[in-house]
Structure formats: structure tokens, C-alpha cells
């Protein structure tokens, strides 16, 4: 494709090779963001917000790379549980999807996610039966200071209603100058949680053996 694009004088944007897709988020996100800006779908202000988030993210890295840090603490709290990750449709549902995928690929842990207010329309009733299993679940609430007041109220009330059902409940949020910075920091923070969860599970977070085996079998079958 690159050769064909060069032949026709088209721009080519490449991501460095050798990285797992989940580890290349910084490259893929930045490239897509710039392309959308050039097409007029993203304002320059958003790009500036991303650029201004670099320094706070670097600070967060230094904090989470210590022997004792909040990401490790959360990984310890959800160890040997099945995490149920709840976010808001305002913003944090994005990081909930990412977090579920990171726990699966890095820590080899099964988890589930949903978002508010939709969770209140159906899933909350599912916490009624199988109490012996529910006690092995942990609930992780991904929150943002700009979540809709109604969503904040729903999360708070739901947390109280589910207090006796889940084994434990945890809140995760980030501070920042704007929603973009807070979202990027939240995603980065939960990435670290998945990394520490892998270490606690005594597994290497890099290989994805089941995915590779799946691809191999599909290539043979198709």
C-alpha cells in the first residue's frame, strides 16, 4: 500500500513496527488526530490540549513507576476478582472499554464493562442472584469531574445499592486542565493497573498466546 501511495504521490503515515497494537496507542492516536484535523473534523484547540497533556502524562509515569503507587494498590485490590468496570457515557466509557481490553491482554483477566446511565436500565437487576459468585466481583467506577450531575447521582446511588453484592468497590479518576488531559491520564493510569495485575498474576503481559493460536487456526480453516 505504501508503494502504491508513493506511486500516486499520496501522503503516507506509518506507525513504527514491532509494537503490540495496544502498546502503540500514542502513535496511532496522534496520527489519526492529525489526519482528522487536516480534514477539518477536529479543531486546533483539541490538538493543543493533547500536546499540553504530554508533560502531565510524563509526571504520571514517574509516579506510577515507583515501588509503591496507586495503580499497584488498585491491582492488589482487584487481584483474584472479576472486575466489573463502569464508566459514564459523557467521557469515561472510552477508558472502560480500553481498560477491559488491557486486563484481558496484559493480565489475562476476564472483566466486563458497561456505562451509565444505561446500566441502570437493565444490568443493575443482574446483581440480584448468584451472591456466592458476585462476592468474587470487584466494581471499578471510572469517574470524571465533568460527568453529568444526573450520571454522578446515578453512580453514587448505584454504588450504595451494590455495596453488599460486590466483593469490593473502587473509584478511579484523574485531575487535569481539561477533559482531554484527564481522559488520557485515566487511560494511562488503568494501563498501569493492568500491568501490575499481570505481575501479581505471575504472567508476562507481552505475549497474547490465545490470540495467536486463534489466528493460526483461522488461517488454516479459511
Predicted segments, located by residue:
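A SIS-like phosphosugar-recognition module
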Residues: 1-8, 13-222
Amino acid at each position: 500500500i505504501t508503494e502504491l501511495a508513493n506511486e500516486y504521490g499520496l501522503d503516507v503515515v506509518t506507525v513504527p513496527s514491532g509494537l503490540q497494537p495496544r502498546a502503540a496507542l500514542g502513535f496511532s492516536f496522534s496520527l489519526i488526530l492529525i489526519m482528522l484535523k487536516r480534514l477539518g473534523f477536529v479543531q486546533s484547540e483539541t490538538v493543543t490540549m493533547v500536546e499540553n497533556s504530554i508533560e502531565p502524562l510524563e509526571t504520571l509515569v514517574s509516579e506510577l513507576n515507583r515501588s509503591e503507587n496507586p495503580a499497584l494498590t488498585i491491582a492488589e485490590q482487584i487481584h483474584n476478582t472479576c472486575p466489573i468496570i463502569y464508566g459514564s457515557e459523557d467521557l469515561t466509557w472510552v477508558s472502560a472499554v480500553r481498560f477491559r481490553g488491557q486486563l484481558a491482554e496484559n493480565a489475562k483477566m476476564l472483566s466486563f464493562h458497561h456505562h451509565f446511565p444505561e446500566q441502570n436500565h437493565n444490568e443493575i437487576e443482574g446483581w440480584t442472584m448468584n451472591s456466592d459468585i458476585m462476592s468474587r466481583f470487584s466494581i471499578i467506577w471510572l469517574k470524571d469531574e465533568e460527568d453529568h450531575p444526573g450520571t454522578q447521582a446515578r453512580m453514587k446511588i448505584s454504588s450504595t445499592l451494590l455495596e453488599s453484592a460486590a466483593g469490593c468497590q473502587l473509584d478511579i479518576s484523574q485531575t487535569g486542565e481539561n477533559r482531554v488531559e484527564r481522559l488520557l491520564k485515566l487511560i494511562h493510569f488503568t494501563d498501569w493497573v493492568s500491568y501490575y495485575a499481570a505481575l501479581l498474576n505471575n504472567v508476562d503481559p507481552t505475549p497474547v498466546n490465545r490470540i495467536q493460536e486463534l489466528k493460526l487456526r483461522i488461517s488454516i480453516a479459511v
